[in-house]
Swiss-Prot record:
Name of the protein in question: Lipoprotein signal peptidase
Subcellular localization, as worded in the UniProt entry: Cell inner membrane
Catalytic residues, chain numbering: 117, 133
Entry keyword set: Aspartyl protease, Cell inner membrane, Cell membrane, Hydrolase, Membrane, Protease, Transmembrane, Transmembrane helix
Catalytic reaction equation(s): Release of signal peptides from bacterial membrane prolipoproteins. Hydrolyzes -Xaa-Yaa-Zaa-|-(S,diacylglyceryl)Cys-, in which Xaa is hydrophobic (preferably Leu), and Yaa (Ala or Ser) and Zaa (Gly or Ala) have small, neutral side chains
Native species: Gloeothece citriformis (strain PCC 7424)
GO-annotated cellular components: plasma membrane
An individual GO BP term: proteolysis
Membrane topology value: Multi-pass membrane protein
Database matches in Pfam families: Peptidase_A8
InterPro entries for the chain: Peptidase_A8
UniProt gene name: lspA
Transmembrane segments annotated in the record for this chain: 7-27, 39-59, 62-82, 96-116, 126-146
Record-stated family: Belongs to the peptidase A8 family.
Length: 160
């Protein structure tokens, strides 16, 4: 069954691994919450923060219901990847990235009650975020691409 939507599973597993690894490295590398390291001072820093809300600290303090939302989304996507007919590659990538992000942040919420964030773009004063947040946005982008119908072979021939 996993062969059917292999890009979905591959992206989800690798993405989840990268997300959890980078969060672990962040926690082990910084002594206290709020510590920062400027990779490109004033532009991009690694900053250790915890987030009890959703992406960009929306719904701050909503960890209880957010953990269940993460679980529901994750289970729904696992069900989709396992039982749905073979998806187009762009759909597999989209759903796989979203699953990686939902699982990554969901694991944190269930284990710790918060999510570890560390990617800090200061040039544009953007909220600190993590790879799971990035993966969810990449997944949405792929699903938006997938929403455009593929060109049929007759359309391809007439546009040349």
């Amino acid at each position: 069954m996993m062969k059917k939507n292999r890009w979905f599973w591959l992206v989800a597993i690798i993405g989840l691994g990268l997300d959890q690894l980078t969060k672990y490295i962040t926690v082990q590398s910084f002594e206290t919450i709020g510590d920062t390291f400027g990779l490109w001072p004033g532009v991009f820093h690694l900053t250790y923060v915890i987030n009890t809300g959703a992406a960009f600290s929306f719904f701050k303090g909503g960890a209880v219901w957010l953990r269940w939302l993460s679980l529901a989304v994750s289970l729904g996507l696992i069900f989709l990847g396992w039982y749905a007919p073979r998806m187009r590659i762009v759909e597999q990538l989209g759903y796989g990235f979203i699953l990686a992000g939902a699982l990554g942040n969901g694991i944190d919420r269930f284990l710790f009650g918060y999510v570890v964030d560390f990617l800090d773009f200061r040039l544009i004063n953007f909220p600190v975020f993590n790879l799971a947040d990035t993966f969810i946005n990449i997944g949405i982008f792929f699903l938006l691409l997938a929403s455009f119908p593929p060109k049929s072979s007759s359309q391809k021939n007439t546009s040349q």
